[in-house]
Amino acid sequence: MRLTKIYLSFTLFFTFLSAQQDTKPEIKIDKELKSFVVDIMGKPFKVERNQNPEHRLKNSYTKTSRPCPPFCVQPFTPVKGIKTIGELELIKFMQEDMSENRGILVDARMPKWYKRGTIPGAINIPFSIFSKENGEVYIDKILPLLGAVKKGKKWDFSKAQRMVIFDNGPWCQQASLAISNLVKLGYPKEKIEYYRGGMQYWQLLGFNTYKPKE
C-alpha cells in the first residue's frame, strides 16, 4: 500500500511537471514589462516581443558578414562624449521622454531603409541632412524642428530636443555620421544618445517594427 501511494505521488508530480513544461512560455521585455504603447501619428502602437520561442529572422539581418568598407564595425562611442545605450535604456526613453515630448527617436538611415520598417515611433532624418556639404538649406529647415533657434549665423540649442539616434546596427555607419555632423553643427553632446544595436539587435530580440505608410 505504501509503495502504491509513493508511486501515485510521483506520477501526479511528473504529470504536473510535464503540464507546466508544455505551457507556452510568456516572452516579456524584462521581468515586469510585457509590452508598452507609443504614439504614431496620433494612434497608439503596441510594442512587444515575438511570442513564438521558435521564431527566426528571415530578412537581411541574419547576415554575419558584409563588405568593409563601407559596412565596417562601428566604435562603441562614435564621438567622444556621446552616450551609447542598450534596448532597456531605449525603451525607457520611448516611455518617458518621447511620451512627454521631451525627446525624439531618430532613424538616421536613408529613406529606402526606413520604408522597409523602423523602430516604432522613430522619425526618419537621413544622416546626410546634417552635413554642411549639402548646404545650409536642409539644416535651416531641420534644426528648428528639433528645437534649435538660429541667432545670426549661430544656433542656440538650449531648448533643443534630446535625441536617440540609430541605424541598421553595429556594422552601419549612418548613425555615427549623423552624430558626428550634429556635433560639428554645435548640437550639445549631452542631448544625443546612440543606440548602437540598431535595427538588427532590435529584431534579433524579437521586437516588432513599424512600416511607414507610403
Indicate residue ranges for each PLM-predicted region.
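Active-site neighborhoods of enzymes that stabilize oxyanions during catalysis
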Residues: 205-214
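Positively charged n-region of N-terminal signal peptides that target proteins for export
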Residues: 1-6
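Short, solvent-exposed loop/turn and secondary-structure capping segments
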Residues: 116-120, 137, 175-179, 205-206
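Positively charged, proline/Ser/Thr-rich regional signature most characteristic
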Residues: 71-162, 212
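Catalytic cysteine-centered active loop of the rhodanese-like fold, especially the PTP/DSP P-loop
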Residues: 143-200
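Solvent-exposed loop/turn segments at secondary-structure junctions
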Residues: 110-113, 129-132, 169-173, 198-202
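Flexible, polar/low-complexity N-terminal or interdomain linker segments that lie immediately upstream
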Residues: 19-116
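Bacterial N-terminal signal peptides
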Residues: 7-15
